[in-house]
Amino acid sequence: MRIRPHSETWLKRPPRPRVPARLRPWLTDPGSLTARIRSRCSLFSVNVLAQRLAVPHPDEAALLGLRRGELAWLREVLLVADGVPVVFARSILPRHDVRGAWILFQGLGSRPLGAALFADPRIGRKPLACACLDRRDARYHRASAAAAPRRLPLALWARRSLFGLRGRTLLVSEVFLPTILELPT
C-alpha cells in the first residue's frame, strides 16, 4: 500500500451526508480549537510528539510556497482532554520564519500553539479546509500511531488552515480522533 498525502481531497466545506452531525461543528468552527476543547473538559494538556526540521508533504509545501523537499519546522502534538487524546495536530512553518515573524513557535514546549495564535490580534486566519483521511494518507498513520493503543476507524476527518503574520504563513492541520465525540457538546 502506498502512503501519501491527499492533496486533492481538501474541501472548503465538509460534505453533509458523509460527516457525522456531531463532528461538523468541530470541523467548521473558525475559533480556537484549544479553547473549545478546554471548555469541555476538566484537564487539558498538550503531548508534544515531535518538534524538528522535516520535509513537509508536497501539498503542505505548496500551501506554504516551499520548494519540494525543502526543510521546514514541524511540530506534532496530541491535544488531550481529561487524559484522553482527542486531536492529533501538525504545524508546519518555513524554517526561515521561526526567527522572524513566528518567533513564538520556538520554545512552546507543551504549551498549546492555538492559545498563542488566538491571543495575538495581528495574526489572521485563512478559511478552513477539511478532508477525510484514510489509510493511504501519511497523516492518518501519524495520528493512528499517536493514539495507540486505541484502534481507529478506517478514515479520520481533519481540518487545516493557514495563519498569517506580517506576510509569513504557518499551516496548522488538526486530525480529529473518534474520542472527540465523547466530549460534551
UniProtKB/Swiss-Prot annotation:
UniProt cross-references to InterPro entries, sorted A to Z: Chorismate--pyruvate_lyase, Chorismate_lyase_/UTRA_dom_sf
Pfam families in the record: Chor_lyase
Subcellular location per the Swiss-Prot or TrEMBL entry: Cytoplasm
Pathway entry: Cofactor biosynthesis; ubiquinone biosynthesis
GO cellular component, one term: cytosol
Keywords annotated in UniProt: Cytoplasm, Lyase, Pyruvate, Ubiquinone biosynthesis
Catalytic activity: chorismate = 4-hydroxybenzoate + pyruvate
Residues the entry annotates as binding substrate: 75, 113, 174
Gene3D superfamilies associated with the record: Chorismate lyase-like
EC numbers on record: 4.1.3.40
Function recorded in the entry: Removes the pyruvyl group from chorismate, with concomitant aromatization of the ring, to provide 4-hydroxybenzoate (4HB) for the ubiquinone pathway.
Similarity annotation: Belongs to the UbiC family.
Name of the protein: Probable chorismate pyruvate-lyase
UniProt source species: Aromatoleum aromaticum (strain DSM 19018 / LMG 30748 / EbN1) (Azoarcus sp. (strain EbN1))
Phylogenetic placement of the source organism: Bacteria, Pseudomonadati, Pseudomonadota, Betaproteobacteria, Rhodocyclales
